[in-house]
Amino acid sequence: ALGVQSEKSGVSVFFANTEASGVIPQISAILGSCAGISVYSPALTDFVFMVDGISHMSITGPRIIKSVMGEEVTMEELGGAKVHSRISGIADFRANNEEDCFLTIRKLLSFLPSHNEELPPIIDIRDDPERIDESLAELVPDDPHKFYDMHQVISHLVDSGDFLEVKKEFAPEIITGFGRLA
């Protein structure tokens, strides 16, 4: 494993990130404080996971902000999981605790191939490929100007309603995620 500590400039880590980009899935789980040059590598990975109350990412800390700008901020306000999930968009997933974080990483990996020359995993989820969902006609109104819940539509379309939403809290008007279609 490459650590930013091994090279002050971080160049070797960034080079590894760019070399692996598009070749293997790169996932970062921030399970503590990550500051300075260390924050750049997770931002270059495909998916960033953060945990409420323990994950922090910022270029500098509250003490420097106070001395330079005269503002008092907490680590949560500066670069907590909520900030990076809702405002900056750096975090793709926000978890309540480490266990939820690892379970979501496992679920994400169930959708991804191990590398760019492999197909995504095929999982038998016991959904009938010939299934016709009549309720979709009721979910989508005839009037194109009426609103409807796209999450409900997606859950009816994907196999067994299995959908993993990415960046759920960032730009909530856009839905991006992974699902399976038989």
Where are the regions a protein language model picked out?
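Gly-rich Lys/Arg/Thr-decorated short loops/hinges at beta-loop-alpha junctions or inter-strand turns
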Residues: A1, S21-V23, K66, R86, ...
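Conserved catalytic cores of soluble enzyme domains
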Residues: A1-E117
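Generic detector of short, locally flexible boundary/turn motifs and exposed helical patches
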Residues: V13-A16, M50-V51, M57-T60, V140-K146, ...
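Proline-rich intrinsically disordered, low-complexity coils
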Residues: P25, P42, P62, P120-P121, ...
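Generic structural motif recognizing short loop/turn segments at the entrances and edges of beta-strands
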Residues: S55-H56, S135, P172-E173
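Terminal amphipathic helices with adjacent charged low-complexity linkers/tails
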Residues: D92-Q152
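Non-catalytic terminal/interface segments that mediate subunit docking, oligomerization
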Residues: H145-A182
